[in-house]
Swiss-Prot record:
It comes from the Eukaryota. It is found in: Mitochondrion membrane. The keyword Transit peptide applies. Residues 72-106 form the SAP domain. The gene is AIM34. It is a single-pass membrane protein. This is Altered inheritance of mitochondria protein 34, mitochondrial. It comes from Eremothecium gossypii (strain ATCC 10895 / CBS 109.51 / FGSC 9923 / NRRL Y-1056) (Yeast). SMART domains: SAP.
Amino acid sequence: MSLRRAKSLPSLKNIAEVAKPITKAPPLPLLAFEGPGLSTCRWYPTTVRTVHNTPSKAQTTLLSTAKKESAFSAMNLKALRNECRSRGLQVSGRKSDLIERIVDFELKGPLGRRGTRRAFHSPGTSSASVCRPVDKVTMPDIALTERAVQQPEKNYILRIPSLSREAASHPVTKSEKDLAQGADEDADPTSEEGRVLTPDSDLHIESPVVINKIEIINEDDYLQDDSRQSSDSQGGSQQDSDGTGQQNFSPRDRRFFAGLTAAVGLWWYFGNKSAKRRMRK
């Protein structure tokens, strides 16, 4: 028998599939949301199978970072800084430092974190993790805000009482009460005839005035008293006239009139002398 050609021989891939068939991994389950919205979610543990097409003469990219370093080394410094900024890494440093940070971040990516997280749990148990929703954005109620602005504030710091005419008549403080009590004690309730004073000045009670007065008068005593009063009145009027005559001129007026009379007397005296001298001549 002649040997078959190499092309007719089954490939190594077919041999491997026959020896160990490839089992397809089940699809990833969807998130099971519980409650209103995205409040809680559960992650079910599943096995993840990844297929890599690696050349026979090249090393796998999972164990070496040469391919990634070559991809980032082709970038300039500005692009590397943008990559670090997008990943939340430190931006300062040289180009080699930036490449190392990015490569370390890629190696510690979500696959590594997911594998370390699932290693602590058994495949039969389920771990529940709380998923925080996106920040809620609430629009303010403009109508309610305008209504609140238009209404006056109810909690005032200082309460101003309303104006009233009775505010001054009612004493409130201790000093006002003391003054009102002192004024009531000093006031004579019989100061006005025919009126009874009360603490409230607006209210007064008028008493009847005594019109008919009954008196017993002695005629002799009445005449003597009348004559005595007339004589006293005449004497008083004379004294008043003398006093008023003396008191009509003030001391200044008296000096003025005295000086005037003295000047007139001197003028008359010297005028007569000059006239006599002329007569003699």
